Amino acid sequence: MTVKAPSVTSLRISKLSANQVQVRWDDVGANFYYFVEIAETKTNSGENLPSNQYRWINLGYTANNSFFFDDADPLTTYIIRVATAAQDFEQSDWIYTEEFETFATNAYTFQNMIEMQLANKFIQEKFTLNNSDYVNFNNDTIMAALMNESFQFSPSYVDVSSISNFIIGENEYHEIQGSIQQVCKDINRVYLMESEGILYLFERYQPVVKVSNDKGQTWKAVKLFNDRVGYPLSKTVYYQSANTTYVLGYDKIFYGRKSTDVRWSADDVRFSSQDITFAKLGDQLHLGFDVEIFATYATLPANVYRIAEAITCTDDYIYVVARDKVRYIKTSNALIDFDPLSPTYSERLFEPDTMTITGNPKAVCYKMDSICDKVFALIIGEVETLNANPRTSKIIDSADKGIYVLNHDEKTWKRVFGNTEEERRRIQPGYANMSTDGKLVSLSSSNFKFLSDNVVNDPETAAKYQLIGAVKYEFPREWLADKHYHMMAFIADETSDWETFTPQPMKYYAEPFFNWSKKSNTRCWINNSDRAVVVYADLKYTKVIENIPETSPDRLVHEYWDDGDCTIVMPNVKFTGFKKYASGMLFYKASGEIISYYDFNYRVRDTVEIIWKPTEVFLKAFLQNQEHETPWSPEEERGLADPDLRPLIGTMMPDSYLLQDSNFEAFCEAYIQYLSDGYGTQYNNLRNLIRNQYPREEHAWEYLWSEIYKRNIYLNADKRDAVARFFESRSYDFYSTKGIEASYKFLFKVLYNEEVEIEIESGAGTEYDIIVQSDSLTEDLVGQTIYTATGRCNVTYIERSYSNGKLQWTVTIHNLLGRLIAGQEVKAERLPSFEGEIIRGVKGKDLLQNNIDYINRSRSYYVMKIKSNLPSSRWKSDVIRFVHPVGFGFIAITLLTMFINVGLTLKHTETIINKYKNYKWDSGLPTEYADRIAKLTPTGEIEHDSVTGEAIYEPGPMAGVKYPLPDDYNAENNNSIFQGQLPSERRKLMSPLFDASGTTFAQFRDLVNKRLKDNIGNPRDPENPTQVKIDE
């Protein structure tokens, strides 16, 4: 037979928003799993669906006692059901939540550094409308920008383009830096590269490189290559893609990247995906700064091997040219040589086809450049003989001179400059060079010469001197100067697709001779004084927070979601070297969406760093539960309807203030009624305490919350959530758990954020007891000191035990000094009426496993020691209020303390004494039948008076009739004698019976009508008082 698994209880909705819902339930035990399903309960038109037409969607299962669903639709009505299952158990019945409707938007609270402001649009899209793609920190590129000192941030800003003019930047400028040095042999063999703030000096035929991070003031030699650097015709030995530097070698092509960059193969960084390219090196070279580490990319093919004239690259291909032949290789997913007999086995291979630029094998290509994936080649002439070395042989004039552009798809080259005789004349070896800055292509030229086209008629001169005719030279705009390097260059731009070259002025001296570094967008050149010249492009102080791709496990920028709460992490952000004052830092997505603005405490310059607190936490967002507004309806009071203060208006103020039916009188009555009935007023709270048998639990519960919030105002959200979770989970049994050790520790943690040591006897693991036989033992013995001739101890708890039908007492003891031996006479120090005999000596026993059982005991005496660094005056009253196990009395103390704290003044007018007895459900049969029974409604509920709220009773049909006593009543109760009485003699008049409808757990009754009360004029005071003041 298969047992059905227990169903969940207390299924409830703990979080509800537009797109998320979280349900919780009470745990049924270990090894059980919970299946969760959801269904819509209304059609698109808003009509209710019958329950048999619900389309249940399985959301999965969980071992936790909660489930979070984050794919709900806004303004949609759902219902959720949960069932339990486990191995060897049949699935339980489904338990359903109430129907609930999601909201139109989500509600979040945010936790971030106080200096940072979030953009409203970011909050609305990312969180309120649940648009996760607006900014996705897991895969989007996040940027930071420094804003100038005049910038004032508004949360209404949406896109960075609207405020880009406030981003700190610098205009393009050049610097003449330190002197260059020979690397090994000759300074004239040196090639210069500037990349990301580091200067590199390569020397042809050498593997050693000199590097400088202080703009050429000091140089350090380091071997960065495993082979020789090549010998191009121009001073450009390297070219860069967006991520990688490629260097032309004598036999090979090298590639390099910073040692701190991503090392692993990936298409998006243009590394080969065939093998691992690098390992993380860091500063193993001990230079004190990071430099690019170079490795072999491929061996040059035979027709350009050791004779390569120039190199360039795009983001997709590397191009090498020699003797008019162009070979190329992919920058990613290049071909691999799998022939084990080949000298390049397992290396990358160039593409098999060869392109020619001019078709003339004697043509000399001096330089190649690349801009926006367009490749240009500069042909400066040809050698006299085939296969001659252009480095050592004379280069002569050629009809093939010019600038050519590549059509890679068709593998053809088209000449875009040099199509006329004059254009070809302007290209001369020693004077012609080509360069780019990433936007323009520039060509240096030989001297200008007047052509026949420049001779035009001059009618003004002919008229002045009365000549038949005159001519003159027409000067075109050629930007002439004595130094041809300085002023004029042929320049092409994007408007003509870089195919129309026109004379334009240079920005810098010898600009077409510069080398361009794409990664840092800088240009460099060795000037005539052998000094490094670097041109820094227009600069905006923006940066990518993290360059690591989303697929890398090293990526730190992430967003983490947990039950609707979001934590966004990112590394610290640092800017250096800016020369203008900055007021703050703007964070935005690469496509322009503004995220937030970090406002510096004071304006900064040169260096600034944001260090996130907590560590690397950019933002935390917490999903808030929302509740639908319910229309107000009067609260139905089922308890006693206490009198209000309105009848006393005449005694509270002089008659002169009370005019018949005046507005003031009506106001006073309304205000006094508010004091009487309004929740939270002093009279209302005091009345609840005095008039009722116990104060209203709801009000005392809210007061407890308010006290905790007062003390937790400076605690962080995690600790406040811990408080909330504790009380939510314990709200139903809070009163039964007061007094256990955990409640004391919890009190000190949430109220004072202090650890505390609690020593309680139940923490020892064992208890000790003795068995005593006595006819005079009562509960008054608890807490007393008992003694014998050989020992003494304190009594913790007493309980009955029987041996052969004879009543004995098991006495739990503590603080034992000496010995207690069976047969000894035992007495109490402050209870002379007690005498007994020890039947069994001290014996240990295991403690009860459930601490709540201690609360359920009858009168007990325990000693609890509290060890805390706080002074006792600070926590003594709170312990009594909140955790001391004094039953409902602790609420009374709470309210009385509250009245004292708020300064309520009390004047003694009378003392009322009520005498009560308690029902004891084990006190046996009553002596008489019940004198009254409750009046029930047709539905079986007790009727209540509509005015006073009191339960209505009717006379019992057998009131006053003796209750029959069974003949064997004493025998059934073992003829036990307690306080000198047999069971039949211990019966009480109103001992409750389980079928007595007049007595319930919720409706208590004055079992003894003894109330000492004076008549002082209050409503319902007795006409014949049962007590009066002395001398009254």
From Swiss-Prot:
Keywords: Disulfide bond, Late protein, Viral baseplate protein, Viral release from host cell, Viral tail assembly, Viral tail protein, Virion. Residues 1012-1032 are annotated as: Disordered. CDD domains: FN3. It holds the Pfam family Gp7_5th. It is found in: Virion. Belongs to the T4likevirus baseplate wedge protein gp7 family. GO terms for cellular component: virus tail, baseplate. Gene3D superfamilies: Immunoglobulins. Intermediate/inner baseplate protein. The gp25-(gp6)2-gp7 module is involved in sheath contraction. Involved in the tail assembly. Its main location: virion. This is Baseplate wedge protein gp7. Heterotrimer with gp6; assembles as a (gp6)2-gp7 heterotrimeric molecule. The (gp6)2-gp7 heterotrimeric molecule further interacts with gp25 and gp53. The gp25-(gp6)2-gp7 module is involved in sheath contraction. Interacts with gp8. Binds to gp10 homotrimer; disulfide-linked. Heteromultimer with gp10; a gp10 molecule is disulfide-linked to gp7 and the other two remaining gp10 molecules form a disulfide bond. One of its GO terms (biological process) is viral tail assembly. Coiled coil: none annotated. The keyword Cell wall biogenesis/degradation does not apply. InterPro entries: FN3_dom, FN3_sf, Gp7_dom_V, Gp7_dom_VI, Gp7_helical, GP7_T4, Ig-like_fold.
